[in-house]
Amino acid sequence: MATKDPTAVERANLLNMAKLSIKGLIESALSFGRTLDSDYPPLQQFFVVMEHCLKHGLKVRKSFLSYNKTIWGPLELVEKLYPEAEEIGASVRDLPGLKTPLGRARAWLRLALMQKKMADYLRCLIIQRDLLSEFYEYHALMMEEEGAVIVGLLVGLNVIDANLCVKGEDLDSQVGVIDFSMYLKNEEDIGNKERNVQIAAILDQKNYVEELNRQLNSTVSSLHSRVDSLEKSNTKLIEELAIAKNNIIKLQEENHQLRSENKLILMKTQQHLEVTKVDVETELQTYKHSRQGLDEMYNEARRQLRDESQLRQDVENELAVQVSMKHEIELAMKLLEKDIHEKQDTLIGLRQQLEEVKAINIEMYQKLQGSEDGLKEKNEIIARLEEKTNKITAAMRQLEQRLQQAEKAQMEAEDEDEKYLQECLSKSDSLQKQISQKEKQLVQLETDLKIEKEWRQTLQEDLQKEKDALSHLRNETQQIISLKKEFLNLQDENQQLKKIYHEQEQALQELGNKLSESKLKIEDIKEANKALQGLVWLKDKEATHCKLCEKEFSLSKRKHHCRNCGEIFCNACSDNELPLPSSPKPVRVCDSCHALLIQRCSSNLP
């Protein structure tokens, strides 16, 4: 018989132990049906077996004080090969209770199992055999095919959910000893397994009832909280409605106040307009009276000019008669020429004054064109005055033409006037008197023109005052327009508030309907909870006959639990599936519970 390699036998033993521990851990975890913690015995034995597998063939490292043989070195190498493992390494180093490398390695294995990536991490490590040769001997388990087989078996552990507390455990001082009694089967173990199965069934029933109660309590509490929140929102909406109604009342009062103020402002403006109209009419009447006085003065001036023209004609006739008195007439004519030159100067001054009057009238006409309809009569009066002034200028031009004709006649009659000089001397005195009278009349005309200028200045001041009053009235009208705009804005806001009020009333009605529906649902849930609290999960041993058809159970007629009432029925009487509050997936329900649940669902539907 050839002797076997002891290292190969060790690898085979460790591989078989790893298979048994992984298989037993998966089967026990699936039958246990809950997340595993650190006190679970199969899980503890799994970590012990993995520790032995990783320690097999590990090289011894020398230090100053002692020899060091630990698995933390190759596990720490995983961070460089697999970047996602950096988080585990950092968290292991940050743990406060770990002092030895072995404790860090044990914590690393537990964290890798919780992340369900232990197989991935160790696969990356096995592939890099040149790096592993620094830590392991050539005949080590991690360097041979058995290591790859163990890594493949570790993939099955991804089915398990584990919640391990690493901080509180003393991982440095634990002794890793494999308990072989867990993997050896006896008759007592078989009896214990049956007991464990019964205990597990009882625990499942208990957990099922507890979950039912917990879910029902949570639904009831959530519905209570919803009812409270809806009541609070209802009270808030009622308060907001009251506030909105108060705001609407205030806005209506402000609206009435603004309307009354608007009416008062309109009354005041109308009164002010009437007063201004009366003032304008009185001023126009005074203006008309003053214009009538001016017309009379202009008529008197025309009469005087006519008299002068007649006197000129008489003088011409007398000059024609008095040709013999030429020498005396020459002296008189020189005097007359001087007087004529003076009169021409005065006429030029009068022309300038008339031009000034024209310019003033034009300016007044342009200013009066910018005023409103109430000042049209003044513009017509000014137009009449301009026509009168034009007539006066035309008459003055005619007088100038006549004077020129008289001068020509005088030049022609110089030869004939020598005969009548003596007679003219006697009449020259009378002419001088007439000239002095005319000079007095000219002085009176100048004073009249000054009075007219002053009167025009007063008219301009009155017009300026009227313009100021018009601008003031325009400002008041603009204020009234702005008040109207504000009033319209307030009306729009009032309409918007009314819309919000109606929308809030509709929302309150909808909330009331929803509250009534939720109250009905709460009552249904309370009734269901009361009915479920009285139900008990019936044991298999207690039931020998079906509750509905009362047929005896046998090998062919199996027992089935109803997940709603907990009673036991045959397959024919419980061949129904419905989703329950305890489980979202459809579960087995008896015929009576099926009919009751369908009736309840149909009644809850709108």
Curated annotation (Swiss-Prot):
It is found in: Nucleus. InterPro entries: FYVE_RUFY2, RUFY1-3, Run_dom, Run_dom_sf, RUN_RUFY2, Znf_FYVE, Znf_FYVE-rel, Znf_FYVE_PHD. The keyword Kinase does not apply. Zn(2+) 1 binds at C546, C549, C570, C573. GO terms for molecular function: SH3 domain binding; zinc ion binding. Expressed in brain, lung and testis. GO terms for biological process: regulation of endocytosis. Its main location: nucleus. It holds the Pfam family FYVE. A zinc finger (FYVE-type) spans 540-598. GO terms for cellular component: cytoplasm; endosome; nucleus. Zn(2+) 2 binds at C562, C565, C590, C593. It comes from the Eukaryota. Keywords: Coiled coil, Metal-binding, Nucleus, Zinc, Zinc-finger. Residues 37-169 form the RUN domain. Residues 210-534 form a coiled coil. PANTHER family: RUN AND FYVE DOMAIN-CONTAINING PROTEIN 2, RUN AND FYVE DOMAIN-CONTAINING PROTEIN 2-LIKE PROTEIN. Interacts with BMX. This is RUN and FYVE domain-containing protein 2. It comes from Homo sapiens (Human). The gene is RUFY2.
